[in-house]
């Protein structure tokens, strides 16, 4: 029998990383287009998801940003940071929502709270009511 597997090796790749997702934005669900109250965006549910991922050994969790009703990413991450011990918190931040000097200070403070376990995802998306070209956004 022929082996059809393709082995990929890299000196810089230790293995695949599987991260998790914190349901900060209302409407996030295990299925697209369905709203399930078990996955609502509140402190109890969302912090439980994050702390469970931390306890189970996940190395990273995404705290998304959205224009939907939900929790603020940086505020939530700051509140849950002292409760974690191992997991990196990947905070998504949309350009234009926060004044850059204030964002810098907030990120620096959060990085101290997490003792270097902060990851940032800067999203260059449109703001509500605008429709810039990709070239202008990037």
Range-by-range predicted roles:
Residues 68, 95, 125-126:
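Positions that flank functional sites
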